[in-house]
């Protein structure tokens, strides 16, 4: 028997669930157990909490200790029946759902639970028979009291509304808030493999919109789409050890087929350079075969061992990866910046997220690249930077390794007769953008009510909600018809609109639902609105309300959506600019970081100095505290060297301008900060 209980807590408090693993015939009385654990009013957990604690569970019948994430959340109490913990008998436990069962010795169950718990002490072994015997006797019943006046009952929908609402505040508990909004806002659902997530239509629409824009633009640059297999032989993956070294701990391997071990292990691609470039060498035989410009829309697997986070740190994610080859460096350099500007447009024009384009430091550039360019975002709520997308110039590093070369078109017959090597290696680029874009958008615009969608990427741009409804069958049909007609008119004009005609839900419940899902604009339509020829419009991002005439409504809404898109970007840009501060003295760096800001500093660009900045800022920020290996670093790392140096004021040139960390001459402004 495995049960999940939920104690009574304050509405604003995070639940502290209790998982009980006991023999089927053990009486697990919740009253004495709650008293032992000092938890009030233990009750069986509802389906949503079960799903949160055990992602693979579809119902209470699927509750099991085996699919728990490792390590389990520190808020979870694990209670193990002493009759199980000390027994060498076999016990049946569900593997992932009630449809699959395994048998383990009781002592092995105890050892397993202790292995996934934050500490062995986190598993509480309880003698339920003794607990029952020591429980206080029930009090004698008092004389019956006069019947109290019956209080009006809350509508069931009130409880639903609380469960549906975002439980965490963005400023107070950002990780809890983020998890809340991506799940309750219907962007993702949890899968039964840790670090893997289901992208629901609202999030996949964002990715499709990005794909449509970006794919159209790169095709104008001469890029063609292709697809290479996801499997990589061990020999091919290890051919470029320097490049793959950074990915080595994250590579997932296929080692079996059925019950048989494979002779050679097969990797699942973490990136595709070593997959694609042998074929570039095969296909590029002459300078006339250049440039070769290919792009893949695919998924890659990087078996992250850190705490996974939807969209930001996942074991499988969707991305595009472009791989191009050119005869000259100048051609390749131009493409690097062309692609980076498209990434900037994705963030700023579609997601309404400001970014800083720049070049990565030597320490932070892509392994095997001559240089890496990037668009860097920043999340003011957490004070951390986040890499948005990268475009790398690989130089001739990979073409030398994979022998991608052509006859130099400038070589003469005399050169050949003289025995000169007339082969030249091609210049290569690679560039990629992933579904991390969605997470950055959520963190930038979301609020305590839920998601806030920029109209350009919203699955639903406008929702029409009927109001002023009456009781009685058929009385509301004219209102429903008017709402559907309004939604159809907007849809015919190319606006993604829907009418919420769900029965059994109040308008207030629907308002909260669509606010949490981030729909940019809500139109309310009732009898008075219909009579007046107007509709009440409510903007999601600031809750501003105004009436629109129904005549010419499509054109009006189209303009308002454009205004919302711009307003979201402008608001985010103001916060972004206020959070990026020029600093010219070391003493101001850590206080600025602690104020949830990034710093722009005069920097010498020396790799050792970069390491020193990271370590020194971490030590000063920690001030002797023990470092939490699971927490993001408190040190400042190089985010990029911005292309637009004038954005931060005139650089203080001259021999007297020193790097803020060392005595070397500073070269440029560099953006440093804490990061994801």
Task: State what each model feature region is.
Residues 1-676:
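NTP/phosphate- and nucleic-acid-binding module
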């Amino acid at each position: 028997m495995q049960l999940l209980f939920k104690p009574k807590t304050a509405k604003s408090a995070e639940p502290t669930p209790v998982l009980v693993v006991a023999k089927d015939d053990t009486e697990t009385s919740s009253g004495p157990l709650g008293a032992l654990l000092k938890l009030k009013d233990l009750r069986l957990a509802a389906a949503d909490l079960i799903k949160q604690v055990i992602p693979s569970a579809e119902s209470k019948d699927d509750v099991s200790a085996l699919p728990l994430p490792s390590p389990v959340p520190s808020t979870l109490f694990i209670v193990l029946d002493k009759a199980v913990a000390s027994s060498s008998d076999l016990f049946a436990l569900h593997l992932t759902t009630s449809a699959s069962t395994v048998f383990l010795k009781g002592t092995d169950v105890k050892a397993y639970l202790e292995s996934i718990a934050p500490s062995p002490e986190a598993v509480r072994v309880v003698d339920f028979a003794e607990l029952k015997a020591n429980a206080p006797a029930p009090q004698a019943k008092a004389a019956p009291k006069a019947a109290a006046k019956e209080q009006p009952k809350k509508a069931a929908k009130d409880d639903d509304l609380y469960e549906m609402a975002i439980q965490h505040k963005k400023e107070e508990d950002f990780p809890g808030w983020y998890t809340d909004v991506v799940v309750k806002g219907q962007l993702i659902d949890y899968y039964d493999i840790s670090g893997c997530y289901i992208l629901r239509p609202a999030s996949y629409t964002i990715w499709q919109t990005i794909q449509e824009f970006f794919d159209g633009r790169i095709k104008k640059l001469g890029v063609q789409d292709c697809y290479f297999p996801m499997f990589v032989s061990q020999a091919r993956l290890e051919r470029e050890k320097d490049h793959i070294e950074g990915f080595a701990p994250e590579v997932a391997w296929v080692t079996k087929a059925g019950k048989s071990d494979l002779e050679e292990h097969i990797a699942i691609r973490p990136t595709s350079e070593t997959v694609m470039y042998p074929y570039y060498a095969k296909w590029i035989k002459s300078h006339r075969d250049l440039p070769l410009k290919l792009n893949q829309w695919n998924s890659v697997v990087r078996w992250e061992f850190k705490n996974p986070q939807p969209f930001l740190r996942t074991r499988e994610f969707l991305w595009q990866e472009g791989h191009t080859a050119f005869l000259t460096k100048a051609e390749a350099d131009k493409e690097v910046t062309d692609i980076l500007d498209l990434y900037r447009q994705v963030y700023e024009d579609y997601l309404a997220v400001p970014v800083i384009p720049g070049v990565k430091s030597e320490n932070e550039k892509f392994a095997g690249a001559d240089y890496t360019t990037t668009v860097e975002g920043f999340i003011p709520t957490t004070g951390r930077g986040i890499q948005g997308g990268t475009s790398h110039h690989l130089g001739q590093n990979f073409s030398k390794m994979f022998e991608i070369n052509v006859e130099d078109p400038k070589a003469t017959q005399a050169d050949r007769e003289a025995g000169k090597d007339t082969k030249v290696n091609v210049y290569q680029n690679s560039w990629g953008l992933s579904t991390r874009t969605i997470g950055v958008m959520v963190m930038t615009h979301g609020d305590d009510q839920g998601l806030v969608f920029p109209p350009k990427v919203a699955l639903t741009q406008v929702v029409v909600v009927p109001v002023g409804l009456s009781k009685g069958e058929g009385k509301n049909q004219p209102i429903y018809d008017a709402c559907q007609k309004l939604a159809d008119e907007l849809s015919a004009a190319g606006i993604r609109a829907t009418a919420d005609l769900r029965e059994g839900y109040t308008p207030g419940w629907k308002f909260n639902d669509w606010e949490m899902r981030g729909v940019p604009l809500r139109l309310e339509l009732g009898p008075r609105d219909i009579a007046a020829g107007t509709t009440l419009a409510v903007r999601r991002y600031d809750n501003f309300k105004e009436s629109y005439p129904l005549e010419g409504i499509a054109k009006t809404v189209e303009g308002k959506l454009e205004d919302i898109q711009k307003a979201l970007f402008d608001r985010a840009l103001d916060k972004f600019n206020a959070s990026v501060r020029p600093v010219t003295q070391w003493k101001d760096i850590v206080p600025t970081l602690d104020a949830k800001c990034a710093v722009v500093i005069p920097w010498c660009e020396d790799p050792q100095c970069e390491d020193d900045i990271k370590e020194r800022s971490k030590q000063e920020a920690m001030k002797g505290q023990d470092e939490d290996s699971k927490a993001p670093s408190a040190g400042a790392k190089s985010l990029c060297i911005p292309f637009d140096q004038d954005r931060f004021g005139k650089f203080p040139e001259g021999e007297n301008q020193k790097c803020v960390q060392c005595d070397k001459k500073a070269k440029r402004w560099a953006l440093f900060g804490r990061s994801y």
